[in-house]
């Protein structure tokens, strides 16, 4: 009998506990469900059902804060209520920091921000929000330190990080030191190129070199950019770094077309079309393994400039461009010419027409005072004659350029 009574008592207690647990689970579940609502009434209901639901209390505080419903004291109390349930809730500390700075309590805002800072670890979203608050408080160092982590963790935010850094900090050295990690350096270099901040690129490139250097794609993009800005000396140094085993002292790179052109930097740019084909001839050549062959289809009166290379020169100096060329059955009087040009300047050879065996030619020119680079290449100008559909083949090999003598200044 006693055992039975004991059993019944234990069963009753367990039943009561189970009912209580179920009720608590239901209450907690309903509160949690309401806590995800953007409706203030449902959020208030969630807090009434379960005051321990820190998420619900925070969301209610945040909603009142953003919509400016109720006074700051009530919103502040809600933030603190959420923290009483979870003191490590970084979003509540950030909310307090923003509330305080909005109401002019900068010291309290900074204290709350520091509390949040110690709890965020490496969350990009929270660090981003913290950065914005730090900027408002004038703590640029903290803001940039946070943005450094954001840029490293979230590639999609890197451009915004760099934009904000330049908008707020303005000092390139500070931005590079505090907001740009080694991992982000290539992306930052690309950003500086896109936004045309030439002076700021040099320390970035130097730091890249100290950390193993950039890949060839980034190096080529930077070399192209520097050439476009007129800094051919640095661009040539970068080019030499891409091809450390090659002789980069020659003014014309890959003059024998022994390597497939990359189409960037100081290498050849070779384009093809339906009417003009470009390939390499391993049998017809003057030196090395192959020559460049151009073949015109005879279907079009082309205006063509499909082979070119940028060459660094000293403005005001004299140069001689030499090459070997041959032709076969090139029709029309407007044949193929070799040309050198830059802004407002052009020198060109006599056109190649008909058929001719290999022959050496030379073109001398003086680099204009405003041209740190010239472009050398092949050209076929569109013809205005009735017989204008060009066909035939042209070969080019052993292209070289040498400096002859500097221009002498004229007497006054």
Regions found by a protein language model. Name each.
Residues 43-69:
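Short extracytoplasmic
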Residues 33-44, 66-81, 102-115, 138-145, ...:
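Structural signature of tandem alpha-helical TPR/SEL1-like repeats
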């Amino acid at each position: 009998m006693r055992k039975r009574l004991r059993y019944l008592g234990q069963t009753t207690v367990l039943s009561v506990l189970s009912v209580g647990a179920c009720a608590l689970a239901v209450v907690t579940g309903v509160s949690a469900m309401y806590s995800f609502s953007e409706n203030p009434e449902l959020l208030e209901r969630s807090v009434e059902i379960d005051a321990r639901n820190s998420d619900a209390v925070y969301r209610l505080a945040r909603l009142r804060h953003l919509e400016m419903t109720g006074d700051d004291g009530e919103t502040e109390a809600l933030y603190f209520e959420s923290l009483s349930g979870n003191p490590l809730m970084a979003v509540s500390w950030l909310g307090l920091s923003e509330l305080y700075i909005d109401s002019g309590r900068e010291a309290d805002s900074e204290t709350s921000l520091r509390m949040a800072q110690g709890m965020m670890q490496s969350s990009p979203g929270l660090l981003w929000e913290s950065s914005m608050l730090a900027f408002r408080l004038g703590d640029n160092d903290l803001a940039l330190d946070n943005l450094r982590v954001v840029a490293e963790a979230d590639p999609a935010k890197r451009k915004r990080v760099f934009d904000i850094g330049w908008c707020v900090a303005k000092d390139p050295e500070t931005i590079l030191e505090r907001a740009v990690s080694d991992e982000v350096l290539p992306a930052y270099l690309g950003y500086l190129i896109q936004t045309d901040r030439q002076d700021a690129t040099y320390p970035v490139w130097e730091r890249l070199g100290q950390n193993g250097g950039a890949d060839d794609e980034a190096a080529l993009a930077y070399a192209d950019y520097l050439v476009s800005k007129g800094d051919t000396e640095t661009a040539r140094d970068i080019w030499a770094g891409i091809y450390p085993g090659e002789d980069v002292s020659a003014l014309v790179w890959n003059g024998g077309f022994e390597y497939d052109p990359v189409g960037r930097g100081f290498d050849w740019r070779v384009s093809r079309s339906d009417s003009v084909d470009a390939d390499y001839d391993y049998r017809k050549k003057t030196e090395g393994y192959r020559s460049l062959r151009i073949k015109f289809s005879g279907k079009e009166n082309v205006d063509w400039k499909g082979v070119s290379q940028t060459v660094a020169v000293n403005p005001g100096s004299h140069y001689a461009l030499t090459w070997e060329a041959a032709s076969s059955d090139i029709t029309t009087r407007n044949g193929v010419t070799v040309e050198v040009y830059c802004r407002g300047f052009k020198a060109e050879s006599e056109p190649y027409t008909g058929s001719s065996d290999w022959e050496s030619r030379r073109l001398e020119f003086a680099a204009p005072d405003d041209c740190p680079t010239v472009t050398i290449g092949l050209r076929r100008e569109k013809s205005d004659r009735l017989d204008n559909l060009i066909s035939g083949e042209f070969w080019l090999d052993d292209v070289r350029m040498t400096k002859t003598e500097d221009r002498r200044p004229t007497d006054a």
